[in-house]
Structure formats: structure tokens, C-alpha cells
């Protein structure tokens, strides 16, 4: 058995800064990489703080705390447990000719009251219905635009809430995701997508640290 075959599903730590562990999982057979991001945010123990982190309101927070990374987050359709979202990403790495990106995906929320957890399942709209994606792109004026899609192949975000005391709750995140970028990235940028995701949540975590 080759080294690649033996280690193809072994997580590799990419970045541990800020007590946030970003790991890469490579599949050498399909030449793909997915990521896991694990971290905890401690917040004042109020229903509003916990609700913002465990509901679709988290996207408002991510947009507000990531002006350098996110141009805009648009919620196209939303019910209590499902939303369709478009994230327009700021034009990063344009110096090497990469077009500005967007992600268009469906997010489904599942609440488990028994273990006080919430799980979000994310999937690119293109993988759900190609025509639906085209309809949304027309609505967003992204047809034939300067933006290119990042394909959100899959995402699973598990959030567990623990009441540490009367004053503080720990909100534990475990995020698995695979987002496909078609560009041929230089070696030093091969984990661009994973590090971009981490930076977004790093800024979110720092917001709550600063506010406490």
C-alpha cells in the first residue's frame, strides 16, 4: 500500500491559530480535499446570544464581521428551518487572475432538543436543481457577470450549546465542508478555501471575545 493510499482520509492540521483547529482531509483517488473546522465560542448566557449563533442570524453576524472577505450575504428564501443563501465574496487573489467568487446554497436546519444541539446541512443549489440555480442567478443579476461560482459540494455544521454557569454559555462548532474551486491555484494557496472559511469564523469569535 502506498503512502497516499494509507493516508488518503487522515486529517492533517492546517492551522491551529486562535484555538480553532482547521484540518484538511485529502482524497487522492478523486484529487479532492475537504475540511473540518472545530472551535468554541463563549458568550454571555442569554437566549439572544445563543439564538444568533444557532439560527440563520449567524449569517448577519458573519457579514458584519468580515467586511474584507464578504461583499454581501443575500438570503433569497427563508423558512424557520430552511434558507437559500448567496454569499458574494470579496475579490481575493485577483493579483494572480482569479475572478471574484460567489456561493449559492441551500441550508437546512435540524434541531435536537435532547442534546441541545443544532445541525445545518448545506448543499449547492446547482446540485439540487440546475434550473433553480439559473433562476436565482437571474434574480441576483449574476448571469454572465464577472463572478464565478464556488461549488458548495457539501457542508455539515454541528453546534452544541453548554451552559457553563449562570453567566456563560459555550457554543461548540464542528464544521465539515467541501467547496470546489476550479482555478489552478499555486501551491502556497492550495488551502485558500479552508483558510478563508476559518478567517470568517475567527473574526466572528473575536467579536464575541471583544464584546464580553
Regions found by a protein language model. Give the residues of each.
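Eukaryotic helix-grip
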Residues: 2-212
Amino acid at each position: 500500500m502506498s503512502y497516499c493510499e494509507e493516508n488518503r482520509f487522515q486529517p492533517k492540521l492546517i492551522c491551529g491559530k486562535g484555538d480553532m483547529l482547521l484540518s484538511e482531509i485529502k482524497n487522492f483517488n478523486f484529487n479532492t480535499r475537504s475540511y473540518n473546522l472545530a472551535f468554541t465560542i463563549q458568550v454571555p448566557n442569554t437566549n439572544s446570544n445563543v439564538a444568533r449563533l444557532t439560527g440563520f442570524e449567524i449569517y448577519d453576524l458573519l457579514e458584519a464581521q468580515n467586511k474584507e472577505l464578504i461583499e454581501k450575504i443575500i438570503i433569497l428564501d427563508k423558512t424557520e428551518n430552511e434558507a437559500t443563501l448567496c454569499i458574494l465574496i470579496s475579490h481575493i487573489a485577483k493579483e494572480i487572475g482569479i475572478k471574484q467568487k460567489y456561493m449559492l446554497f441551500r441550508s437546512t436546519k435540524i434541531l435536537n432538543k435532547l442534546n441541545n444541539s443544532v445541525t445545518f446541512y448545506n448543499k449547492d443549489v446547482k446540485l439540487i436543481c440546475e434550473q433553480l440555480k439559473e433562476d436565482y442567478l437571474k434574480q441576483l443579476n449574476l448571469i454572465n457577470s464577472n463572478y464565478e461560482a464556488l461549488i458548495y459540494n457539501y457542508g455539515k455544521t454541528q453546534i452544541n450549546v453548554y451552559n457553563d454557569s449562570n453567566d456563560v454559555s459555550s457554543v461548540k462548532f464542528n464544521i465539515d465542508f467541501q467547496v470546489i474551486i476550479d482555478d489552478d491555484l499555486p501551491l502556497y494557496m492550495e488551502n485558500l478555501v479552508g483558510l478563508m472559511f476559518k478567517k470568517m469564523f475567527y473574526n466572528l469569535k473575536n467579536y464575541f471575545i471583544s464584546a464580553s
